[in-house]
Amino acid sequence: MVEKNTYFIGVGRRKTAVATVKLMSGNGVIVIDGKPIEERFTRIQERNVILNPMMVTDTMGKFNAVIKVLGGGVTGQSGAIAHGIARALEKTDEKLRAALKSNGLLTRDDRTKERKKPGLKRARKAPQYTKR
């Protein structure tokens, strides 16, 4: 499927987080910012989001991943990593594209925090209305 020394790069984004994913053939070791996935993301929900592209394409123990992630919080980072893994998996084999696309893993989730408007307390919350 993939030669030993080749690797595939995918860049994923979610909210303000950006993840650069390097996939290479291996036995399923995932390292995020120099730490194993279990140490970096302790909650099972985030790990499931990250591993979802590999579960969908049935490539769970076939690739090692070295991931660098910048910005955002835990949810944004896990979403960015999943997006990056999906993009890198697509480069490994074009046949995986259909499975990834049908599960919405190649689509960039563009929902970001809405900016605060002048005259309002938050993006949409207005100060309390007083009649008199």
Curated annotation (Swiss-Prot):
Residues 114-132 have a biased composition (Basic residues). It comes from the Bacteria. InterPro entries: Ribosomal_Su5_D2-typ_SF (IPR020568), Ribosomal_uS9 (IPR000754), Ribosomal_uS9_bac/plastid (IPR023035), Ribosomal_uS9_CS (IPR020574), Ribsml_uS5_D2-typ_fold_subgr (IPR014721). Keywords: Ribonucleoprotein, Ribosomal protein. One of its GO terms (biological process) is translation. GO terms for cellular component: cytosolic small ribosomal subunit. GO terms for molecular function: RNA binding; structural constituent of ribosome. Residues 103-132 are annotated as: Disordered. Belongs to the universal ribosomal protein uS9 family. This is Small ribosomal subunit protein uS9. The lineage of its organism: Bacteria, Bacillati, Chloroflexota, Dehalococcoidia, Dehalococcoidales. The gene is rpsI.
